[in-house]
Structures are given as C-alpha cells and as structure tokens.
C-alpha cells in the first residue's frame, strides 16, 4: 500500500501528569515536524497519566491523595475542548488497600472504567491476585492492558493486544498516536510464583525498541511508551 504523504508539519501534545498519591501536576509541550514548510496543522492532544495508585482511590488530604472521584473531574475539565485525549496508567493499580483486596481489585477496575482510562501497563502488585484475575480486571475496567514483553510459553503475547492506536482528525488531516507498554522482567520475582506461572517476562528494552519501530512503520506520528520498571535508567 502506498504510504500517504503527511499534510501537517507541527503537532503539539500537552501532557498532564497526575501523581494521584502526591497530587502533583505538570504540563509538558511536545512537538514533532515532518520537514515541510507549509500546510501546518496544530493538534491539541491532552494526556492524563497516573501511576502507583496502589488502590488509594478515596480522597485523603492528610496523605495528599486526590482520589478517583476528584481525578475524574479534573481530567474531564482538562481534556474538554481538546482535539483528542488519552487517559493512561503505568501500573501498581489494583492492589494495596482493603477496598481493593477484599474484592480482588474489582472496585478499582470499576472506578477506572468510570474515569475513562484507555490503557495501562502492569506493575508487580497488579499480579497479586494471579494472572487470570488480572486479565479479568482489564475487562471490568474496559482498559487495554499493554505489557507486550510478557509472553506465554508458546511465544504469543499473554495480554490480548500489544498496542493502542488512536487516530485524531482535524481539518481533513490525521494524527496517529501509538501506545505500547513494557513491564520489568524482575517483576516475576516480586510476586508469588504461581501468579505468573508459565509466563516469560522478556527483556523490556529490546522489546520497547522493536515495538516503537513497529508502530512507526505502521505510520504512527507519535509513539508513547508506558513502563513500570525497577531500573529507570535503562528503560527511560
């Protein structure tokens, strides 16, 4: 198939990062160019990101936890009027507080669905209920779990999909965003062995390089990696 020539030359992506436990906020502009001198289109894409929630879903001013209800409202206000948006999480989400553990993460999954999360990767604590339950929680949350470096014994991906691709159209021009996720292989040693029995946690850096190249080859203009790692220097 003949690859279509890009019609736009500038993309602006605003990244809002929420530290749901600490209540930290930030906005980061990111630009990409195709080298053309005309036909510029600016896409206003807003991304809401959380990580290490550890089932702290209730607002707690004393411990500086904003809670899922407040997060949902802030995210809705922030993304209103944008050309497109994504809500992403980097794991350690479904486990850590009685409100979650008593129902094996279902309460958190339902709140994630209500907030409108699009995708997440996994942290070691997300495997605490076992691998099958983690898949179930992804379904309850209606969120794509992206940890493509985690494989079954036959080499196929454990989760249903390795990537999320979102297309945003404006003024007849399309921006294609690809999202993938990686989880630290060391996670296999950070949970009960039976929770991850039969799974192969492959090298995160090697997988990330391959998947980023794949998404670019598929025409993605922006590639986002979600990672949960104990070694940020080698994954960043």
Each predicted region: which residue ranges?
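N-terminal targeting leaders that route proteins to membranes or the secretory/organellar pathways
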Residues: 5, 29-36
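Sec-dependent N-terminal signal peptides of Gram-positive bacterial secreted proteins and lipoproteins
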Residues: 8-30
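Acidic, metal/ion-coordinating pockets
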Residues: 33-236
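N-terminal secretory signal peptides that target proteins for export/translocation
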Residues: 1-7
